[in-house]
Amino acid sequence: MDPNAPDSERVFGDFRNCLNTFDAWAESFWSGSALEVEQVFKVGDEVELVTPVSSKTPSKTVAMCSAQGSLTLVHMFESTRFVPIGNTPVMLQAIAADGSPMGAPLHRVIGLSGILEITECDRNQPYQITFYPTVSQDHVKALYASYQSVIAGLEGRLREEWTATFQPQWKDFASASSLQRSAMQGVAFSTGMAKALYSLWDNISQLYDLLADLKANSQKLLAYLSQAELDELLKLGSDAIAKGLLVLSDEPLLFIYVSAIVSWIRLLPPPEMYELLGEITGEVLINLLLMWATAGTGDTDGNPITAYTEY
């Protein structure tokens, strides 16, 4: 085997631990901006508050007790799957038309399920509801554990690609000349890849805003999509767009998929890697994420490796 071939087990190990890298990048480079995990407070289907998971500031909102005399409170992570945040104190205070408090407040705790049904409220009475977030390391561990099936599935696909395709190609490449030059080009590629990733994360929030008002921003999206791809995007229904927005707001999931693409590239033999050197840019990665996020594959079956090879 060519000694310059990648240590495939190290690549797979790095990918398995990609969420540790996510934490490091979030803290070191973006100070909690593009890579901040967020928590969601919901009251029924009408009210939704989103704040950084690191925030301990109480979140307040006003909602009406239903005609059935109940209110459903939910505390969860902003994710493509439901991951509850339990043990969250809440306070409900009935308020008058002028916003002044009426009577004694109700103090309750959202349990481990992340859902609390309040049945003691007065029908059609407005309440000020205050959530007191206390997100712990155990909560974050539970969030990360929810992604393990995604990571395992993608690692399996990477191993298949390595065994069936890349490993034989590396063996064929072992007798090629200019290995030292190849290694130097590989360093240049890595630098370009890092710059592309920085560009990608810098534009995540912009992508979210563009999709949130798709028709008004259609011309701006042409910076990332072809006209044909944009036409297909404009045909999507509101549910598909909403799912795409949720995917783009699920930063750990996005990071997992980008990490899978990076791992796939790390396994490539030099000839294939150099071919990509001039093609991998922040815009290319953004294009991939846009196509993936809005194609209805923002779940455990989504496969950025297939998307990239097809792209």
Please identify what each model-predicted range represents.
Residues P271-Y311:
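Hydrophobic, membrane-inserting alpha-helical segments
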Residues M1-R266, G302-T309:
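Cationic, glycine-rich low-complexity segments
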